[in-house]
UniProtKB/Swiss-Prot annotation:
Keywords: Eukaryotic host gene expression shutoff by virus, Host cytoplasm, Host gene expression shutoff by virus, Host mRNA suppression by virus, Host nucleus, Host-virus interaction, Inhibition of host innate immune response by virus, Inhibition of host interferon signaling pathway by virus, Inhibition of host PKR by virus, Inhibition of host pre-mRNA processing by virus, Inhibition of host RIG-I by virus, Inhibition of host RLR pathway by virus, Interferon antiviral system evasion, RNA-binding, Ubl conjugation, Viral immunoevasion. Homodimer. Interacts with host TRIM25 (via coiled coil); this interaction specifically inhibits TRIM25 multimerization and TRIM25-mediated RIGI CARD ubiquitination. Interacts with human EIF2AK2/PKR, CPSF4, IVNS1ABP and PABPN1. One of its GO terms (cellular component) is host cell cytoplasm. It comes from the Viruses. A motif (Nuclear localization signal) lies at residues 34-38. Gene3D superfamilies: Influenza virus non-structural protein, effector domain, S15/NS1, RNA-binding. This is Non-structural protein 1. It comes from Influenza A virus (strain A/Equine/London/1416/1973 H7N7). Inhibits post-transcriptional processing of cellular pre-mRNA, by binding and inhibiting two cellular proteins that are required for the 3'-end processing of cellular pre-mRNAs: the 30 kDa cleavage and polyadenylation specificity factor/CPSF4 and the poly(A)-binding protein 2/PABPN1. In turn, unprocessed 3' end pre-mRNAs accumulate in the host nucleus and are no longer exported to the cytoplasm. Cellular protein synthesis is thereby shut off very early after virus infection. It holds the Pfam family Flu_NS1. One of its GO terms (biological process) is symbiont-mediated suppression of host cytoplasmic pattern recognition receptor signaling pathway via inhibition of RIG-I activity. One of its GO terms (molecular function) is RNA binding.
Length: 230
């Protein structure tokens, strides 16, 4: 196993522990708590994949961080912060919408890259909107936290989420996953609309009204992908 992979996991575990202590003091805002929950799942998945104990890794990560801080000067810290581009966290969904329970009458699931796509193909003739919470850097989607498809009544009928055991995805990965989700939902004569925020940063190939246009051939291809590969 690569030593950098292990040490990276150890540092991530310790930094998550610090953030958890911060949250326990009720100091974290909604995006902070959201990322904390998602990162916890990711760390559990990585720990299982690497065969490493999280508590032991956290202690080792603490030693690594302490050693770095001992060598770090205030001036170097200022220069590092100034050189790192700042990302923005954008939220289409409230915490209630993100945590809302849902079930599927006709479940379909597909994994593409490090993203998991789930949808209920029993949904027909509904107006559906896609909403997402994600971070943006350089005016492009950086990290998808969660994307969900809602009916006008507020029911969740689809979802795209990162796989905890496979961290890391690109803007193109997210765009492809959105295309698969839209294709599956539109096959049952649902009307699918993308939120303005999501359309701006992650789905630029749509019309101004947020309704992506797919030719019939592409619709059939997407539907076959959902049916045959899920």
């Amino acid at each position: 196993m690569d030593s950098n992979t292990v040490s990276s996991f150890q540092v991530d575990c310790f930094l998550w522990h610090v953030r958890k202590r911060f949250a326990d003091q009720e100091l974290g805002d909604a995006p902070f708590l959201d990322r904390l929950r998602r990162d916890q799942k990711s760390l559990k998945g990585r720990g299982s994949t690497l065969g490493l104990d999280i508590e032991t890794a956290t202690r080792a990560g603490k030693q690594i961080v302490e050693r770095i801080l001992e060598e770090e000067s205030d001036e170097a810290l200022k220069m590092t912060i100034a050189s790192v581009p700042a990302s923005r966290y954008l939220t289409d969904m409230t915490l209630d919408e993100m945590s809302r329970d849902w079930f599927m009458l006709m479940p379909k699931q597909k994994v593409t890259g490090s993203l998991c796509i789930r949808m209920d193909q029993a949904i027909m003739d509904k107006n559906i909107i896609l909403k997402a919470n994600f971070s943006v850097i350089f005016e492009r989607l950086e990290t998808l936290i969660l994307l969900r498809a809602f009916t006008e009544e507020g029911a969740v009928v689809g979802e795209i989420s990162p796989l905890p055991s496979l961290p890391g995805h690109t803007n193109e990965d997210v765009k492809n996953a959105i295309g698969v989700l839209i294709g599956g939902l539109k096959w049952n004569d649902n009307t699918v609309r993308v939120s303005e925020t999501l359309q701006r940063f992650a789905w630029r190939s749509s019309h101004e009204n947020g309704r992506p246009s797919f030719p019939p051939k592409q619709k059939r291809k997407m539907a076959r992908t959902i049916e045959s590969e899920v």
